[in-house]
From Swiss-Prot:
Topological domain ranges for the Intravirion compartment: 69-77, 134-262
Protein name, entry field: Membrane protein
Quaternary structure, from the entry: Homomultimer. Interacts with envelope E protein in the budding compartment of the host cell, which is located between endoplasmic reticulum and the Golgi complex. Forms a complex with HE and S proteins. Interacts with nucleocapsid N protein. This interaction probably participates in RNA packaging into the virus.
GO cellular component: host cell Golgi membrane; membrane; viral envelope; virion membrane
Protein species of origin: Canine coronavirus (strain Insavc-1)
Protein keywords: Glycoprotein, Host Golgi apparatus, Host membrane, Membrane, Transmembrane, Transmembrane helix, Viral envelope protein, Viral matrix protein, Virion
Transmembrane portions of the chain: 48-68, 78-98, 113-133
Length: 262
């Protein structure tokens, strides 16, 4: 495997440059040589030298990164999901700081073309960051849920039952919503969102909140077994508008609760 890696390094290395020997006692030593054996020495610059000495460390970091991206979902692990959210939050300020710093360095050495690219990158990053906050705040106004600030959340399912509001982040707007009741546990999209419920506690409508509007889903069918508190209820889109999912419950009819505006 090492031979293959060294040959690959030879293929992608620059023709002109220092020959860094990977077979010497010191991994950081280099020598000027005309040896043509790519298995012992390879043509390289700083990038290939870095990969040759830090490839294991980078492989471990990338494995962790892939694991976080692949399994950073609530259905797998809430802990990994939290790490993924933290990484995504930190990427915006880190990228913005790097582009600003690079723009400063390029301006100091009078490389104005690269300075322009750096300024453009910083501007785009800042605009995208502001757009994220605007959409998150709009979604939070409708749902009062901190899931609104998850960068991957584009919609939030809101279910009112037993005098409480339950929320579940979604990646998109569903055509229909199915609530499943299993031995008194209310589940949506495969997640348990409430417990200790019976068939009389199922809501007549549920809502899916987006940053710009709220979609109301009305109950159209259900099949329940009262003896075991088990069954399902299906909801379809009925209307959309500037509704709040956190409707007041004092002295309001069901229709007034539904039409309670933000």
């Amino acid at each position: 495997m090492k031979k293959i890696l060294f040959l690959l390094a030879c293929a992608i290395a620059c023709v002109y440059g220092e020959r860094y020997c990977a077979m010497t006692e010191s991994s950081t030593s280099c020598r000027n040589s005309t040896a043509g054996n790519c298995a012992s020495c390879f043509e390289t610059g700083d990038l290939i030298w870095h990969l040759a000495n830090w490839n294991f460390s980078w492989s471990v970091i990338l494995i962790i990164f892939i694991t976080v991206l692949q399994y950073g979902r609530p259905q797998f692990s809430w802990f990994v999901c939290g790490i993924k959210m933290l990484i995504m939050w930190l990427l915006w300020p880190i990228v913005l700081a790097l582009t600003i710093f690079n723009a400063y360095l390029e301006y100091r050495v009078s490389r104005y073309v690269m300075f322009g690219f750096s300024v453009a990158g910083a501007t785009v990053t800042f605009i995208l960051w502001i757009m994220y906050f605007v959409r998150s705040i709009q979604l939070y106004r409708r749902t009062k849920s901190w899931w609104s600030f998850n960068p991957e959340t584009s919609a939030i399912l809101c279910v009112s039952a037993l005098g409480r509001s339950y929320v579940l982040p979604l990646e998109g707007v569903p055509t229909g919503v199915t609530l499943t009741l299993l031995s008194g546990n209310l589940c949506a999209e495969g997640f348990k969102i409430a417990g200790g419920m019976n068939i009389d506690n199922l809501p007549k409508y549920v809502m899916v909140a987006l940053p710009v509007r709220t979609i109301v889903y009305t109950l159209v069918g259900k099949k329940l077994k009262a003896s075991s508190a088990t069954g399902w209820a299906y909801y379809v889109k009925s209307k959309a508008g500037d509704y709040s999912t956190d409707a007041r419950t004092d002295n309001l009819s069901e229709h007034e609760k539904l039409l309670h505006m933000v």
